[in-house]
């Protein structure tokens, strides 16, 4: 796509300087912006807040983001607020995100929910390129926005594709399409009467069935405490995926936060940094 057609674009490179991870080659324009990194609680890991200065995604918007994480670098990426997809009467919204992780690099990508309002059409394509020694924690939350009738699924569709490559080999292709006009997404086999959806990937060379079982034990009680469903499965590589159905965003955020904390403490021997958005 020609650069002039992007509604917003962002490029970011993070490298390890011997003491901590730092940024370079930062470029952004139009509706996308990245705030100067912060090192929460004297951490050596920078946290970047990605901002849509327009306040929401509109009819025909196109966004592009490319993040490079060099050898031994670590970074946390998050958004400053929810991604709001408003009605798109003429053309859908597109978002393309590429993440390139080198040796021993680590990416935490924990964004706020994607909210699709009435008559919204949204397409997101993520490409995640890892080496054998790099690792990743990535989350998504999908939430139905306000509609005049109060019904939950009044958006046109939400289409999310995640491609994960390790050493240039495709190991995971996740193609999620929620189209209320063509699918009974409220029924068994889709959302099963729930309205909110959450997912996470964790890839690390130490992931095995024992670790997956331990993570599941950590989060399984939420299904009894809250009205939600939680599942975890091993990816066809050294990683796992988590799926969550619920009626509230806060429940999904709590479960994903528990998983993120478990990873931080048990894999990286550190406490999770509070992102201080509010």
Swiss-Prot record:
GO cellular component: cytoplasm
Keywords: Chaperone, Cytoplasm, Nickel insertion
Keyword Cell division: no
Name of the protein described by the UniProt record: Urease accessory protein UreD
Keyword Disulfide bond: no
Family to which this protein belongs: Belongs to the UreD family.
Subunit structure: UreD, UreF and UreG form a complex that acts as a GTP-hydrolysis-dependent molecular chaperone, activating the urease apoprotein by helping to assemble the nickel containing metallocenter of UreC. The UreE protein probably delivers the nickel.
Protein source organism: Staphylococcus aureus (strain bovine RF122 / ET3-1)
Annotated localization: Cytoplasm
GO MF: nickel cation binding
Membrane-spanning parts: none
Pfam families: UreD (PF01774)
Predominant subcellular localization, coarse grouping: cytoplasm
InterPro entries according to UniProt: UreD
